[in-house]
Design a protein with these regions (language model features):
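Intrinsically disordered, low-complexity regulatory regions enriched in serine/threonine/proline
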Residues: 1-2, 28-34, 39-105
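Short, hydrophobic/aromatic-rich segments at coil-to-beta transitions
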Residues: 18-25
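Amphipathic alpha-helical segments
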Residues: 1-17
Length: 105
């Protein structure tokens, strides 16, 4: 996957741009990022916000080593499939965005 494909996948699956990074938010605080992807020139970095407010790197991978899952399209190589609760957080973010579009919010 390249930067454009990863961005398209993320935006279609609940991620949103916050402060220049693709981000997932808490359901209770939809403007505050708790997971972010930093798309750099040759690598993508996934960071998780700790309760103290500091960002901790969870994964980093070169674009050339990212492969989209054949069934879900989810990029393999960043650990999304093994991070507990990640899929649910992504689904909550996507559902909130869809509902906001339906209600005009």
């Amino acid at each position: 996957m390249d930067k454009e494909a990863l961005t398209a996948w993320a935006l279609a699956n609940g991620w949103q741009m916050i402060a220049g990074c693709l981000s997932l938010t808490k359901p209770s605080a939809p403007k505050e990022a708790i997971v972010r992807m930093q798309l750099k020139a040759t690598v993508v970095t996934v960071e998780v916000k700790k309760p103290a407010g500091k960002w901790e790197k969870a994964a980093s991978q070169a674009y050339g080593k990212l492969v989209a899952d054949e069934e879900t399209g989810m990029p393999r190589g960043l650990g999304f499939e093994v991070i507990p609760g990640f899929t649910m957080l992504m689904r909550d973010n996507r559902d909130r965005q869809v509902f906001a579009k339906m209600t005009g919010g």
